[in-house]
Amino acid sequence: EFESTILGPSVPDLVALTNEALSISITQKKSIIDTTTIRYALHRKTWDLEADRNLSPAKEHGTLFYQVGRAFAHTVLLRNCSIDPISIYIKKNLCEAGDSSLYKWYFELGTSMKKLTILLYLLTCSAGSIAQDLLSPPGPDEQNLITSYGLVENDSDLVHGLSDIVHGLLELEGALVGSSPTEEEVEGTEEEVEGTEEEVEGTEEEVEGTEDEEVEGTEEEVEGTEEEVEGTEEEVEGTEEEVEGTEDEEVEGTEDEEVEGTEEEVEGTEEEVEGTEEEVEGTEEEVEGTEDEEVEGTEEEVEGTEEEVEGTEDEEVEGTEEEVEGTEEEVEGTEDEEVEGTEEEVEGTEEEVEGTEEEVEGTEEEVEGTEEEVEGTEEEVEGTEEEVEGTEEEVEGTEDEEVEGTEKDSSQFDNDRVTLLLRPKPRNPLDIQRLIYQHQKYESELEEDDDDDEDVFAPQKMLEDLFSELVWSPRIWHPWDFLLDCEAEIPAEEIPEEEDELPEDALETEVAVWGVEEEGEADDEEDVLLEAQQEDELLEEEDEELDEEEDELDEEEEEPKEEEDELHEEEEEEEEEEEEEEEDELQENDSEFFRVKPIIPRHRWIFRKKKDVFEVLSYPEEATEISKELLRLLNPKTKRDAPKRPRQRWWTKKKQDKHYELLLDRQRWLITKRSLSKSNGFFRSNTPSESYQYLSNLFLSNRRLLDQMTKTFFRKMAFPG
């Protein structure tokens, strides 16, 4: 069928055919291109090309299957490339002179390490036989670099391999629809899969080798940086040692210079003393030398004179005797004078020696003074060191105190130590009703004594006190009460004695006040429903009696309609003001605490059961209804609501029954709502603030999950493997 086509093996025709097949598959929303799509694309392109030119038919129809698979791989894996690298290895005619550079570029792309894994994946997915031929070892007779990698020379082998893969994909599509492939096809696909796995293992080994080399290079760089860091640390230590050395040298230099200066002064004074001693010794030696020389000279002169005297004795005995006597006197005079002069000189030198000794003693005293000064400087240095140690101790002490202070200051932020800020405990509406009942009873007893006084009850004052102090009491902060229900056992001792004074209907209907609900077994719920039905029947009978009495009263009444309209308008205005105040208080409380749940605490004498599981809720709608009823009772607008006589009690049994009817309706609504929520089996929030908190937590958790997914995705993209 495919041999009758007129498409040639040129690249433009094949690209046009593949694009046509892809466009058809996209318009038909097909994930796999089958043979019918290829036939339809071939038919359309044939009639488009027949008008332009006539080409020879294709020899191998399997090439079309390969081209379709190549186009699919190109659009999925290589969207940024202009031409698929596999098309380079299809035909020999692509390796022409005009396309040699492009062919070489794609050849380098296929044989490079960077794109090798992508190319192998593409080849193993779309054409396993091409990968086997491309990676085959080169033959001995091949000389060209391009053919040394075992490029495909025969088109038939290529086409058969590609057609097998395309047929395998088509059979896989049929298997997904319902048909199963044959055993031979399964064996062929298994062999191809084994070949591709071996190729993938080879590529993984190459990739591991490159990764090991890169890791080793990075480790060497890290070691080099660590050595540089160590070198810088050694330089820092050297600079610190130099700084310490300079500080020590400065301190020691100042001390040594002062001590050495004083020692040099002492040595100089000692040298001066030694010089003076040497001078004294020299003067003594001179004195001794002069004495010896003079004595010897005088002796020689005496001897010469004696010889002369002896020589002349004979000749001039008489004349010489006189001369000798004269000379002897002269000699004695000269000797005495010289001896006295030398003695005076010796005494002068001795005085000089004594002066030098005194100077030496003065210098020694100066040396001792300098030594004392040195000791004083040393003591000052020790004192400065002690001061430095003291300052260091003070700094350490201040740091410890600051650390302790910060620890103490930070203790207030500890969650375990933060006390709960509990607001005042609110009052129970049942207590309010009980107080009103007692007050009315007391007032009725007072009215018996004073029949003329009609203003004893003071309903306006009671109304103000009721709504200012009791009804709108502040709500308590309990953030986790909506998760768990309370269980409590009430002993009989705690039940007040005034219980018998209340009406029987009040005790029976207090079960339904303010959303009180018993979450026990199914039998308890049925009992509550039966009691509610019985009470409904009693209330219907009483309502009929009330209607009859009201009809009688209406006949007697003849009041103008204007007064009723004015009273009605005033009542509506009061109700609107009360509702606005109530909404403002609720908004303020909800804005102050994000998860506030208004809770009215349970009264002690509501139930006496051992297992009393309940949950108390407050709803503004029911509160407004009760307030309206109380307003109507305390401030009547018609005579039928007011007492007929001063002694008549305002809080009658029928009015109580009318009031409790609203509470019974609320109890029925709560029971049905709770049963529905239990049947659904999931927690449902009871206040808008809780539902807002639940939704905010849900969106925050989803946002965190999305952030984690994006972080992991970018981490995988930045650091693959």
From Swiss-Prot:
Keywords: ATP-binding, Chloroplast, Nucleotide-binding, Plastid. Residues 182-404, 492-508, 516-591 have a biased composition (Acidic residues). ATP binds at G174, A175, L176, V177, G178, S179, S180, P181. Residues 176-424, 492-592 are annotated as: Disordered. Residues 405-417 have a biased composition (Basic and acidic residues). Its main location: plastid. It is found in: Plastid, Chloroplast stroma. One of its GO terms (molecular function) is ATP binding. It comes from the Eukaryota. GO terms for cellular component: chloroplast stroma. Belongs to the Ycf2 family. Probable ATPase of unknown function. Its presence in a non-photosynthetic plant (Epifagus virginiana) and experiments in tobacco indicate that it has an essential function which is probably not related to photosynthesis. This is Protein Ycf2. It comes from Oenothera picensis.
